[in-house]
Amino acid sequence: MFEDNNQKRPLYIPYAGPALLETPLLNKGCAFTSEERSSFNLEGLLPQNIETIEEQAERAYRQFMAFGNDLDKHIYLRNIQDTNETLFYRLLHNHLTEMLPVIYTPTVGKACEEFSNIYRRARGLFISYPDKDRIDDMLQNATKQNVKVIVVTDGERILGLGDQGIGGMGIPIGKLSLYTACGGISPAYCLPVVLDVGTNNQQLLSDPFYMGWRNPRISGEEYAEFVDAFIQAVKRRWPDILLQFEDFAQNNAMPLLNRYKNELCCFNDDIQGTAAVTLGSLIAACKASGAKLSEKRVAFLGAGSAGCGIAEQIVAQMKAEGLTDAQARGRVFMVDRFGLITDKIPNQLDFQRRLSQPVGRIADWPVGDNISLLEVMEHGRPDILIGVSGQPGLFTEEVVKTMHKHCTRPIIFPLSNPTSRVEATPADLIRWTDGQALVATGSPFAPVEYKGKRYVIAQCNNSFIFPGIGLGVIASGATRVTDAMLMSASRALAECSPLVKGAEGSLLPDLADIHQVSRYIAKMVAKTAMLQGKAVQTPDEVIDQAIEANFWRPEYRRYRRTSF
């Protein structure tokens, strides 16, 4: 729990020569000192000049800027990550706002689609169904022994791009990069995993260069048993792991979370992380206008696991503000491709049924059976509109202007990723509401100029939440991720909103402040874990010390030679 993070202490290294240069966690390149070059048999293997990490980072940045498109920049950064991780994170530290969209959304989506074509070097674990009886051995093969955070995907629902098979590995790699860059979690503790259960993407199956298991996806009992075999093996190998489920399809995401959330320390970022950052943003938006969330009405376009996860967090916050469960749910309207979800619609999933509107509550609406989003705008009169549909352009001018008729300051969050899937662009939303809409998006957008005013578009990015949650779990030794811990993360994020502190501020903090935001979220998460008995009670100052002790910095340490 209270690990020494004094990076001035030397590391004792058993590797030497080319083996040391080929170890990304330890390689310093031309920053090895003369003493280290002699001690580790590196003389003659490196150019003569000894550089600082800042000199290396400046050269790397110049090379980065020479590439003409973001996918090539992504490939370049991944190459640095696979050769010198400390330099990679120093480069991100120096240019985080610029590079975050390159290492993660939206560029990571294209990298996943092209995974087999741009593959350079293995990172993480590829666990394929044909090898299901050897999962324990595979975990022993991991190059990192003291793993504390795993991000795992099966590649079936990658962003808004669907089934990418083994190419989904780009998401765990990218997410864990953010755990380190934003939350200070050492890369030595992070392990990306893809469960290769086949793919139903015919384009991939027909591609001669596809690197995954060439088979249709397994499902049902076969799938459940395979995932369980993986989970049980992880528990044997790393009993105190924090495991994040990532980009699982709707029919698997919620069942897996419900099955394992009380068995190990785990959460689903698409459901819970997205919900937490969205709720934090909404709380901040309401505070800035002097209102409570419980006074608002909320419409969703998209009623999958992510949308319903956000809705449940909103309901929980409304109840915390004094509403009954029925009152809170009556203020939430879930719309899918068939229209508003009501309690008379058959074949609903369990998590949708809890959010369906009773037909009696909308009996006075002059509408037919399939109630459109536009009709919800007209008769439900929501103040907040959230898009998690994965379908572009569905927040039409008519829908938005209808909302604006009854809502002076509409809050509109088109959250679908990547940018090509967004429900409406910020420029359109601001224009259609004459600059009155408060907008946050799932992917990054440039500021919008409208009538002489500049509107900064907040990115409702999970990177404001999950790194802090991870840091809080590791620092406190929490054994579970609970709903209350996620709620604490949301409220902590809202407290960090510049808009709450000043009318002209941004809805979410600047990425330049992400380390302090993550530290604060980590502290609130840790305190809640302790209050719930999920971590050992310690005073505030000890929590602060634990967070700092676990906050890794991209700096080279001195090396001393030792033997195996």
Swiss-Prot record:
Keywords carried by this UniProt record: Metal-binding, NAD, Oxidoreductase
Q: Tell me the enzyme class.
A: oxidoreductase
Q: What is its EC number?
A: 1.1.1.38
Q: Which CDD domains does the entry mention?
A: NAD_bind_1_malic_enz
For the ligand (NAD(+)), the binding residues are: R157, D270, N417
Indicate which residues the UniProt annotation says bind a divalent metal cation: E246, D247, D270
Give the matching Pfam families: malic (PF00390), Malic_M (PF03949)
Q: Which InterPro entries match?
A: Aminoacid_DH-like_N_sf, Malic_enzyme_CS, Malic_N_dom, Malic_N_dom_sf, Malic_NAD-bd, Malic_OxRdtase, NAD(P)-bd_dom_sf, NAD_malic_enz_proteobac
How the cofactor is bound: the record states: Divalent metal cations. Prefers magnesium or manganese.
Which reactions does this protein catalyse? (S)-malate + NAD(+) = pyruvate + CO2 + NADH; oxaloacetate + H(+) = pyruvate + CO2
Required co-factor(s) are: Mg(2+); Mn(2+)
Any idea which residues are catalytic in this one? Answer: Y104, K175
One GO CC term, this protein: cytosol
Q: Which GO terms describe its biological process?
A: malate metabolic process
Q: Where is this site: Important for activity?
A: D270
One GO molecular-function annotation for this sequence? malate dehydrogenase (decarboxylating) (NAD+) activity
Indicate the family of this protein: Belongs to the malic enzymes family.
Subunit info here reads: Homotetramer.
Q: Which HAMAP family match?
A: NAD_malic_enz
Put simply, this protein is called NAD-dependent malic enzyme
Q: Which species is the source of this protein?
A: Aeromonas salmonicida (strain A449)
